[in-house]
Amino acid sequence: MPIMLEDYQKNFLELAIECQALRFGSFKLKSGRESPYFFNLGLFNTGKLLSNLATAYAIAIIQSDLKFDVIFGPAYKGIPLAAIVCVKLAEIGGSKFQNIQYAFNRKEAKDHGEGGIIVGSALENKRILIIDDVMTAGTAINEAFEIISNAKGQVVGSIIALDRQEVVSTDDKEGLSATQTVSKKYGIPVLSIVSLIHIITYLEGRITAEEKSKIEQYLQTYGASA
């Protein structure tokens, strides 16, 4: 069955390519892998781009029907994401999203004023949705889980912009991706605006056959099990 993209996903990918947040070529990743594409959400750096980015996150969240009280953005990349998506949910999500709160952590605890490492909403006895850009080794979300657990909050899900759909390690017999690993470990859904298969579908006719072939080969080599 062919993969269908919704309008918000198409718009997200169009803008990602336009602002070069999504680029194609040959890129060395932290993992040491040579990737035929590179994704940098930090290039969504204007008011217009951020508004559209927030809309994409918000629609993905609304469609998931996930019940939560607080959006938590791990420092640093998650901080602006939590804020803009909280605002966008209030704008387009209807009455049940009007009072969604947001919070983030400091990298270093503050020992004066209000103190602590949590800024924004208190997390105790709250249902928490963690927001971030991508998930690779899952390190950031593991740290976020610890912070939220220490604050007596309950993580009910996570959302990222792009699911790369590749195995964390080629030695993993289960062949799980970072998102699948986190979902299995913590028993939560990991949502995304788009995944690599959406990118491949969207790019049909927009890139050369050679570029498309390289992405498909990369997915065949490093792709996670379904």
Curated annotation (Swiss-Prot):
Enzyme class: transferase
GO biological process, one term: 'de novo' pyrimidine nucleobase biosynthetic process
Binding positions (orotate): F38, F39, T136, R164
The entry's keywords: Glycosyltransferase, Phosphoprotein, Pyrimidine biosynthesis, Transferase
GO cellular component: cytoplasm; nucleus
Miscellaneous note of the record: There are two genes coding for OPRT in yeast.
Annotated function: Catalyzes the transfer of a ribosyl phosphate group from 5-phosphoribose 1-diphosphate to orotate, leading to the formation of orotidine monophosphate (OMP).
Subunit structure: Homodimer.
Protein name: Orotate phosphoribosyltransferase 1
Species name: Saccharomyces cerevisiae (strain ATCC 204508 / S288c) (Baker's yeast)
Gene name as annotated: URA5
